[in-house]
Design a protein with these regions (language model features):
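Acidic, divalent-metal-binding catalytic cores of TOPRIM
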Residues: 1-208
Length: 208
């Protein structure tokens, strides 16, 4: 039973063995990882951030997503000339621009700079932190909370002093960045802003 003759031999039918499907892999941002993880050709749209630490944190959490979408994150090195830089970039429906600035407080220089840009293909968002370090949850790096530093004192130096850390800011940044393994280690306001910027620039119309 269960046998049949094929080319003179008795053979049996067997169900094809299927590889067991494991759970979907997730990226650090919480997205389902794509099977094809090769980077795509960069799209013309861009995301600009103010500092290298901002760029490194975004790469740490959203790097896989950005490479898959073909979105490049570039460092502004200061936003004083933002309006002129936006004009030079020439945003349009095929080439959108997302900008992440430090906290935009009413009446601040950054707020005035952002107000100079009025273009439907540009989205400017901020995060509510004095420094991008604060966007990392204290618990992720083993502290109760980020220390308060008086206005006028260097924030990074003040934090290191109050935490009793002897390292210089660049070394401490590498340490705390290494503690970030996913979006769960980052404060919600930054997560929301970055996700909105990615959604905005990836929604640009394809070029003909």
């Amino acid at each position: 039973p269960g046998l049949f003759r094929h080319e003179g031999d008795l053979v049996a039918l067997r169900a094809k063995l299927l590889k067991k499907q494991g759970a979907s892999q997730m990226t650090a941002s919480g997205s389902i990882a794509a099977e094809d993880t090769s980077a795509r050709v960069a799209l013309p749209s861009r995301i600009w951030v103010e500092g290298i630490h901002d760029a490194e944190l975004i790469e740490r959490v959203w790097g896989d997503d950005l490479r898959y979408e073909g979105i490049v994150v570039e460092q502004l090195e200061g936003a004083d000339d933002l309006a002129a830089m936006v004009r030079e970039f020439s945003p349009n429906s095929h080439q959108r621009l997302g900008v992440l600035l430090d906290h935009l407080v009413d009446g601040s220089k950054e707020t005035r700079i952002a107000a100079q840009v009025d273009d439907p293909n540009v989205l400017i968002l901020d995060h509510p932190y004095v420094d991008i370090w604060q966007a990392i949850k204290p618990g992720a790096i083993g502290i109760q909370g980020w220390p308060s530093v008086p206005k006028g004192e260097s924030w990074k130096e003040g934090v290191l002093k109050r935490l009793g850390v002897a390292a210089a800011p660049p070394q401490f940044w590498k340490h705390i960045l290494g503690k970030v393994s996913s979006w769960k280690d980052v404060e919600t306001p930054l997560v929301n802003s970055v996700e909105q910027l990615i959604d905005f620039v990836t929604a640009a119309e394809p070029a003909d």
